Amino acid sequence: MSTAKPSDPANPTPAKLILTVIDGMKPTMVQRAMSSGDAPALKAIADRGQYVPGCAAAFPSVTPVCAATIATGVLQDVHEIPSMNWYSRAEQRYVEYGSSFSASRRFGLNRQLVDTIFNMNATHLSPDVPTVFETLDDTEQVRTAGTTYLIYRGRHEHEISRDFALTRAASQLFKRSALGPRELFYADIFASRKTSCWSRMGLPGMRDQHAGCVGSYLVENDLFDFMLLSLPDNDAHSHKNGPHAQIQSIAAADAELWRVMEAGGGTDAFLDEHAMIVMADHSHSSIERRIDLTGAFADWRVLPPSGAGARHAELALCPAQRSAMIYLLLEARESALTSVVERARAIEGVDLVMWWDAERVRIGGERGELSFAPGDEVADARGRRWSVDGELDTLLAHVEDGVLHCDNYPDGLTRVWAAMNCPTSGDVLLSAEPAYEFPDWGNRAHVRGGSHGSLHRVDSLGALLFCGVPAPPQRTDGNWSIADVAPMIIEHFGAA
């Protein structure tokens, strides 16, 4: 077991804590990497603490939604980041966080960058929910730090760095500051201090080494108590090469984590003094076929990325890898809803369709249909209670001893309920069958590679490892969610 300082409220100096997010880390792949010796840093953490092979993502299981949940400890019914691509009813336009370069070009590169780098934190993320950075900053006793991560909102103001020609150009283009942790290093755009670290503006393949460089610098110079260390390159590698190629990219991420540990005196000395949480935001599954979402609604007036003809548009379509959302832009929404749901359920590759039916959420698919809402009829595996009507086989679920088990769609009711109750979500949500993906607005898909986004377990269950910090009492029986991590961190520092 870890000998790091315990997270005891009576202890005035809890151990420093690093939350490391390895984007898309698949449990079977991290287990193989640890067994083969390709992930010695992860194995050291698991050996000292606990390894959880199944931690449920949010739904849609895409990075912006999951990053917001990890950073806040709540799902999107509270944090309000609905997907990778969504439609803003308030601004009557699409919001695109970078599904692909081709998609970003269609929406406008400047708009996409502003939405992703600034608006996601400043306006899209609910101002009513604090991030872990904000909660710890408010104590005025915990020094916070973060590397390039989508959700970085804290209490400290940062100006755009002028260390490189590109960032000097960015400072002229964006002309704005951002609120983040005390030490913020975001793709060269924000850099609290001058270091030798460079990410080439956050290019895939360069981001992990940038995080390792920054993390090592922060360790060597004793500049944090809590650090979020983001290692995102595994996701891009898995998208391109498929999830079963992850051992190579997990090994690369592990090497940067090892680098950070070496900066603190080596693995044993480092883990004696630091609590560690390493997690995936979601998993990955193999992709073989594309889903023709736009073709299915070719006879409807669909709002294009340019926004042209917005006054006459009937639908906004928002594909996000293995999930999608449909927004009804018509005044006659009720009559349109029935037609849209019927059309969506007939699309090849669509597994589940979700929509509102009065005060209940309805889920339909080839195996049947059910509706549900919070109630007192049955408990799920995490203890939440529900009223459920219809065919449980819709979610391949069953009830045993008064508990609803939904192994193929982990924490399924809670995740769907949060998605449907998110005020910025679409009116109809879609989840793809295994092996299928919705191409983005740039017509990019990951056929013969990997992807994620659906409600299904193949995308939803990521790996979690931790040492030096205890598991919450209610999680001793498993059934973890990525929403459990922020409360662990806040409790560790006595900031609850």
Task: Report each predicted region and the residues it spans.
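His/Asp/Glu-rich, glycine-adjacent segments
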Residues: V74-K240, F372-C406, S425, P439, ...
